[in-house]
Amino acid sequence: MPLKPISFRWSKTSVRSVPNPFMYGPDNLNKPLSRASQMAERVHQQTPSSTNYQQRRYFSYYYYQFPKIPRPKRNMLYYSTWSRNPVTNASNANKPSKRHMLPFGSFKISKRSFANANQKLKTKLKKLKMGKERRRFIRWWTVTSLTIVLGGVYAKIKYERGDHEENPYKIRPQSWHLYAYSALPLKTISRLWGQVNSINLPVWIRSPSYRVYSAIFGVNLDEMENPDLSSYKNLSEFFYRDIKPDARPIADGDLVSPADGKVLKFGVVENGEIEQVKGMTYSIDALLGIDTGKLAAPTHSLNFDYNSDDETIVKRDEEFAKINGISYSMDDLVGGNSKSTYHMNELTYKDEHDGTAAGERASFSKELRVAEELTPNPVEYFRKKNLYFAVIYLAPGDYHHFHSPTSWVTTLRRHFIGELFSVAPFFQKTLQGLFVLNERVALLGYWKYGFFSMVPVGATNVGSIVVNFDKDLKTNDIYEHEVYSSASSVNESTPLLDQKDYSANDILTITNSEYEDKKRKKLRKNTVYEATYTNASRLLGGYPLSKGQDIGGFKLGSTVVLVFEAPENFKFNLKVGEKVKVGQSLGGFV
């Protein structure tokens, strides 16, 4: 019995419930395409939004959306590269291996690679990994190289400055304000300030500028030797102005003030320490350089414009010694005749084939060595005498010259290369060893009671320290003086007083062409440059200075420190904070 074809009735309301017409085959096998077209058209009418989307997407009127084959999303870590450590032997199954005792010790890299991964993805990951490793290597190499280079540069600068040596008075600020201040290039700033002060001002602006400065810092214009303010070309000349001779009368006492300023501290040196402020001290050895074992250049004897062997000069020195009670035979320095007594003109030496023996007359190097041995340690020879000190601060408005505080003989000059911190009272209370750290010039010698020294100390914006009779002294500079650069080579083990004397005449005989070939050395911090004044007087062994005599000065305000030996009955007639002037009595004997 033949089967009847199954027919379906279509309606808009029953489209979704009618089964697929092709499930059991088409009604008319002769028209399969028309039937399929009708079904496709009906499906297309039921989904107008998708049709419009496809038309907009593919710019066509009709598009048949073929079914997509679903592809599972594969995880890249599906095939793990880590696998458990297999048990190779049944007998070792219960024994933990060494891998299990370590972190991730039970894992190992599998031989199976990402064989099913996309080759392009593998290449991309490989390039990313190589780029990351390259950047990591570059960063490591760059940082390491820069660290080594900068460390070497810092070490070189530190060595040239002399910071490689341990300084017990090194600034260790307790606050970031002082640390930032100590890190400033104060020497460079001071040099620039000195150059600015040396710029000549127009005539019309000189007088108003100097009057404004005088009003700010309290300068007394009435005592100026030259009252015409327009005659001072620049600020430097105005700072270093002269005053009338009768403006500073000299007192009759044994010791007078060397400068105008405020008394910061005075007293007796105890245990070789000078009190800066209460609870803060610094060593006298560090201030004067008594124990300095090496110099930046050989010691040389300064030459003067006159002949010390001239009969007039000898008589002048004899009269100076008699008036001021100074013995040129060094008897007063050692307390009479004993095994330790040496007379400057009576020293004899054995010829030890070192070139120092010169018959009956002593060489200057031997005389200086004896003087350096005896003079800095006078307490050993003067049991009834003390070492005293006084510190006087010069403000920017004060008279900037310093004078001789007594009649004495200076035999040695030591120029200490250091910092240029401010010496204002605030920093003296804050920075320990301030006067030891700063650049200074120590004039050492003797007076009728024993050892005597005067130390002008530099400060911030102090262009230079001037000593009138020392033409080779140049402070706050970058390079050392030509005298030291022209001398023979010297190493760090050079003793304080060399076996050989270097006179300025011998050194300056080098021609200009030879000197130009020699490169000037830069000044190194914490080093000393030394000169002797023995050529000033064969009789006194140094340069004689009378009480009240103008010695030199500062280009701006600073500090003067006196360290001297005197009997126990010497008393200061001062008060801390008192204002003193040149020639005013500092103390006397009671």
Swiss-Prot record:
Which residue positions are annotated as catalytic? 260, 403, 558
Q: Which GO terms describe its cellular component?
A: endoplasmic reticulum membrane; lipid droplet; mitochondrial inner membrane; mitochondrion
- Keywords tagged on the record: Decarboxylase, Lipid biosynthesis, Lipid metabolism, Lyase, Membrane, Mitochondrion, Mitochondrion inner membrane, Phospholipid biosynthesis, Phospholipid metabolism, Pyruvate, Transit peptide, Transmembrane, Transmembrane helix, Zymogen
Name a GO molecular-function annotation. phosphatidylserine decarboxylase activity
Coiled-coil stretches? none
Task: Relay the cofactor remark from the entry.
Answer: Binds 1 pyruvoyl group covalently per subunit.
Mitochondrial intermembrane topological domain:
160-590
Family, as annotated:
Belongs to the phosphatidylserine decarboxylase family. PSD-B subfamily. Eukaryotic type I sub-subfamily.
What is the purpose of this protein? Catalyzes the formation of phosphatidylethanolamine (PtdEtn) from phosphatidylserine (PtdSer). Plays a central role in phospholipid metabolism and in the interorganelle trafficking of phosphatidylserine. Important for virulence.
According to UniProt, the name of this protein is Phosphatidylserine decarboxylase proenzyme 1, mitochondrial
In which organism is this protein found? Candida albicans (strain SC5314 / ATCC MYA-2876) (Yeast)
